[in-house]
Amino acid sequence: MEIASNKGVIADASTPAGRAGMSESEWREAIKFDSTDTGWVIMSIGMAIGAGIVFLPVQVGLMGLWVFLLSSVIGYPAMYLFQRLFINTLAESPECKDYPSVISGYLGKNWGILLGALYFVMLVIWMFVYSTAITNDSASYLHTFGVTEGLLSDSPFYGLVLICILVAISSRGEKLLFKISTGMVLTKLLVVAALGVSMVGMWHLYNVGSLPPLGLLVKNAIITLPFTLTSILFIQTLSPMVISYRSREKSIEVARHKALRAMNIAFGILFVTVFFYAVSFTLAMGHDEAVKAYEQNISALAIAAQFISGDGAAWVKVVSVILNIFAVMTAFFGVYLGFREATQGIVMNILRRKMPAEKINENLVQRGIMIFAILLAWSAIVLNAPVLSFTSICSPIFGMVGCLIPAWLVYKVPALHKYKGMSLYLIIVTGLLLCVSPFLAFS
């Protein structure tokens, strides 16, 4: 039913414009694609194309193309659905300042701090991974190309200075972060696409391999599922993105529409590019090269440089440096945004138990979080902890934070019952598979 107003005719309540209390013309004006939308698409792609993408073809080569295809059939649709549900559960929340406050609004303060802590642990692991990776890799490249005589990473202060610079950039606001990330992310995307295309001339059908027995196929597909998902996963940026849109837009419907649109665009670009890249590398590289890369603990790019001769090898070497550094830097920015938001949620949850909310100095809290993030990242750098060995526990955390918790909210909160359906069952199954995947890998 349409209702007349001084701004025009309000659209039918069954449409997004109607739910937002707007006319169709007002709705079209409100959802216009702008620089902020572009920025969040860029940040999401930057988060997804992290350091792990250079190892994806190795995992696919080890397990076989059939395993990857089955894993993709399960993983990519499920990932799209659970990221969509994650956005919807955040956007529906009456209070949308940070992830723990959203959970608190739905389930109470105790659940908010418990599930917020789980989300926090996931982001701490990635803070460890990316802060250590960017310190060691940048120092290694500077030494390799003769810029420095020794490794700068041997000095603890190199890592401290580097992290301070990255955190300072990340904390200056979205506009600066979007500007810095745009060039790096577009370069990464073009590099990944170019690498996939460059391998087409070396495709061999025998690298497709034979179809393995059903039991082994399913088991290996579940083991490969975390690698498939994390190749284009950007759940770490979804919470800051929704919160940003909610703070900018008066209408929840407009904020939800813009967040979902940014996610859809990023997902589509990532799926086409990364899926082609992984399949192209597998058809060119094959199982034997993947085993060699695994045994030498090197990336697909490094092994490609070994079997590509002539000028192509030099090109792959240069490209690998660009992809590696840009991938780690932009992923660090995305992780830091999520880490800052999660930490703020936990701190505010604790402080509100001790004092009235109006007496809390949020600026002081944010400065404290910056210092905490720097010290946390620096401690990982100084200890040079084998953080990559910790990343396997991220699969169950992704399963819980991205799939099982949003699904539980749908069943628990009456306002979210509208999201029940077959897609929710697929999300739940995927969440359970992510939780058991590490145990199958080591069985």
Swiss-Prot record:
One of its GO terms (cellular component) is plasma membrane. The keyword Cell inner membrane applies. Signal peptide: none annotated. Its main location: membrane. Keywords: Amino-acid transport, Cell inner membrane, Cell membrane, Membrane, Transmembrane, Transmembrane helix, Transport. Residues 70-110, 171-182, 236-264, 389, 443 are periplasmic. Disruption phenotype: No change in sensitivity to excess L-cysteine. Cells produce about 15% of wild-type levels of hydrogen sulfide in the presence of excess cysteine. Induction: Transcription induced by L-cysteine (in vivo), under control of DecR. Member of the dlsT(yhaO)-yhaM operon. This is Probable serine transporter. It comes from Escherichia coli (strain K12).
